[in-house]
Each structure stands twice: as structure tokens, then as C-alpha cells.
């Protein structure tokens, strides 16, 4: 029926036509495989990232289900030790992996016309835990209205009432349970607690500028500024692998592989039956009696669908890939958060500049290795906030992260002086991009085209980001620390100058999403239905950030884990959790911006 909706005739006709070659190849391959012992599981999960780790943990709670988890990258521990894998597990060492291709796909975009022709670097996790093993450990759920919007966009059953219980189920917050927080979940969450004087001064400055202080931006009131929640536990990064995968490894019904690249999904007609993968240079096959589940993320999941014959038929044929199902939404609807750094010199030697000098780094590292304490035990992005950019905006559309340091080129260039900065950017940009296969070779990175700043609305929103940040930085609370403005610089004042600065300096916040959009079967851009099943085929799901219909207002790790928790219940046939009429803050008036 789905292929008929796509205008390609009956599924049977498609199988005899465009699928003929695929079926004959598949039949020969399956016949050949039949002569060998079949490596069969209930579920094959591709990708041990934020979502895949959740699925591995939850699906193997039933001892009758056998699960194979395949990850292209290495394990996140060396010889079972987090200390030996300090680059991953020491929170302050997060920049160490941003350019390390042992743990990172190291993607790059195409040339961005809206960013002065620049090519942007996109680090993505390629390790157990995925990007939750590389990210800044900020735990942000987004706004309740994001999930109401998903419902309106066709993701029925994914409104806030049906998502909040899964946020709670996943979360083990150090502050205990509430209507909004979970206390007993596997994902350990703590509140920023260094009380660095610059963090305190920043929060005071935001209040002097007229913004509220929120005690829990993941609870009743996202709007305002406050201390951030972090996926840090006892001084160590708490990734999805720490939360879900490692506790499940002792189960006999879970097999978790590392350094294993899946090259395609295997089909019998339009039914997914397994995957083909490469390990140690050898090709292997694994079969799923129930389902194959893709959890590779917003780049790898659509890439694997297309390599397997699911995507835009014309594009696949050009690369010689047999078409299983014409699904033109695959790889489309690419969305990402873009951000800019506003940097200010600090007149006092209290920033993290000295902590990045060689001898001091050694001391910090030794303390962390010994006790998991000290400056190595935090990511330092401990305060931030969410505000509305202008009157009439119903809920926050700008996000701030404050850092008592200076970041240059993704941290690849050492800091040059005592300075502090804000990472700021719009959360619901209107520029939408796409990704496509570069070739039929699974090892080739896809073509990534985010189309950053391709709308006038987006550049106007960034203009507001710069102006509103400058207003906060000018408040009295920061006067004792305020030196000259380093970026954009006091000479940048007019709208035209600000726009030029943004186009020259804006960079990705590392939040790609929405490339396998969830929606109704009648939506020609949808890839999966609200049960996470790939449209037009059987026994195949996608569960990760790629299925978001649209971006959430914040970081993506917490929502991705929520998606996987909810999907696990769907897959197991459990009744959906829901919590009706949970109060959510609304401004008293929209006539003012704050």
C-alpha cells in the first residue's frame, strides 16, 4: 500500500520490477547463507549510541529475546577501566575526542553559502555510547510545546503527556523524584555545582537584565537562566553505554560487538531479515527473527537505509543500488542547531585559561585519575538558559550556555588569554537541509548539506542573539570581571556588521536530527510511522534522533534516550506510559520579550 501511495504501483508489481534484481541477488545470497549455520537473533540493533544502548538494555530484560548490538567504533573502556579511557570518561577532557577519529566519524558538510562558503566540521560519536560518549554532558529535554508540535506534525502518541513519563523512567536525578524528575532510572543526572564566581556573576547578570531564575529548566519552567543538569555521576561522564549497555553485558541473551561496520540490511522482498557487516576485514551476516532496528543517528541511519535500497529511487538507481522501496523522505528534512560564541576578556585570573597549561593539566588529570574529583570532574558548562527572542514568541527560542573560558576552533586551538564566553543560538531555525549518498561504498561519508542561514528569519534571529547577549554581559554583576569584548569586538555594531560576523563565525552545536522523519503514512516526507516502523517495508525500524519530526528546543541526548525508552515499550508491546495535564509555565503576557 505504501509503495502505491508513492506512485510506484502495487508492492507485488514493484517486487517483479524494480525489485527483481534485488530479489534474485537476495535469493542467491540467502540460499548460500542457508548452507551455513545461521547467526540468528530476535533483534539486530545497528548502532550502540544513545538510542541503541537503551534498546540493548531494555529488550534484553526479557530473557527469551536474543539481541545483537553492532557498533562501528570501539568499546568505550580499555581493559574494563574508565581510568584507562580517560579521554572519554573525564568530563573536562571532552574536547580530546572531538577530533580523534578512533571515536569519531569526523564528518564535514558541503560548502555553506550562508556561512561565507565555509565547510563545517561535524564530530559524531563512533564508539560505545555514540555521541553521549563525546558530548558536553548537558542534560536538556526541550520544551513541552516541542512534543505537542510533534503530535501536530503526525507523530501521534508523542505529545508531552506521552513523552514526559519516559524522561522520568530514564532519569536517575541526584535531587530525587518530582512530577517532572525521575530518581530511579539508569541515566544518572547531577546539577552543576562548582559555584565558580563567573557562573554566579553570569546568573546575577541575567536577572539584572530582567530574566527569571528557573530552578529546573527541565521541569515546570524552561524559560529563564539557572544551573544546568549534567549527565555526570561521581565525577565521571555517564553516557548511554554507562547507563544501559554495561549493566546488560552480563546477560547471556545480549551480544554486543565493537568495530563492526554494517554495510546493508538484508531483505526477502520487502521484509527485513538481517544485516550484512564487516568485522576484521571479513564479511558476515546476522539474521533477525523479529526485527532489524537502526539506531545509527541522524547521519548513519538514513545512509544505511539508502545503501539498503530504501530512499529516493532515482538517486539509488544512479549509484547502482537495487531499489527495495521508493521512500523520498530518507535523508531529507535535515535540521541542526547553529550557534555563535560571544567572548569577553576577563580582568581577573579566575578563568580556565591556567587550567589548560601543560603542568596544570597534568595535576588536574592526576587528581581525577586518583579520586574522580577536581576540575577534571566537570564539563564546566554549568549555567545557561532559555529565553524568548522577542514579543509574541510563545516559548523560548534562544539557548545560552555559559563557559568560564574561551573556545577556539572546537577546542583544537589553545586558549590565548583569560576570557569567558556564551554559546548562543536560535533553537528552532527555519533552514532545512538534506544528506545523500556519495557512493554505494558504506565507508564513504555521505554528502551533508544543512543549508545553514538560508532564510532571512535565521539571520535575523542570530542578530538578536548577539544583541541580547551583549546586553547581559553589560550588566553590573559582571563589571568586576569585564575586559574588552574579544568576539565579535566593539567595532562590530551595525546590523550589517553583525550579520557578517555571524556568517563568518557561526558553527554547528552538533545536533543533527530529523532525517528519517516520523509521521503519518499519508505524509510524502515521512520515513517511519509513530510506532517507529519504516514505511513500505516490514520488520524494520529506526529509533534515534533521525526520527524527530522537527528539532526540539535544546540539546538532543536526553530526547534521544527518551525516544528509545518509549520505542522499547512499543516494540515489547507494553502499554504506553502517559501523564495527563502536567502543569507547564506560560508567560503572563506575550506583549513583552521578558
Curated annotation (Swiss-Prot):
PROSITE patterns: GMC_OXRED_1, GMC_OXRED_2. SUPFAM superfamilies: FAD-linked reductases, C-terminal domain, FAD/NAD(P)-binding domain. Keywords: Acetylation, FAD, Flavoprotein, Membrane, Mitochondrion, Mitochondrion inner membrane, Oxidoreductase, Transit peptide. Its cofactor is FAD. One of its GO terms (biological process) is choline catabolic process. The modification N6-acetyllysine is found at residues 484, 496, 580. Its main location: mitochondrion. The keyword Mitochondrion applies. Residues 1-29 form a transit peptide. It holds the Pfam family GMC_oxred_C. InterPro entries: FAD/NAD-bd_sf, GMC_OxRdtase, GMC_OxRdtase_N, GMC_OxRtase_C. Pathway: Amine and polyamine biosynthesis; betaine biosynthesis via choline pathway; betaine aldehyde from choline (cytochrome c reductase route): step 1/1. GO terms for molecular function: choline dehydrogenase activity; flavin adenine dinucleotide binding. FAD binds at residues 42-71. It is an enzyme of class 1 (oxidoreductase). The keyword Transmembrane helix does not apply. It is found in: Mitochondrion inner membrane. The modification N6-succinyllysine is found at residues 436, 484, 496. The active site is at residue 511. Its EC number is 1.1.99.1. GO terms for cellular component: mitochondrial inner membrane; mitochondrion. Belongs to the GMC oxidoreductase family. This is Choline dehydrogenase, mitochondrial.
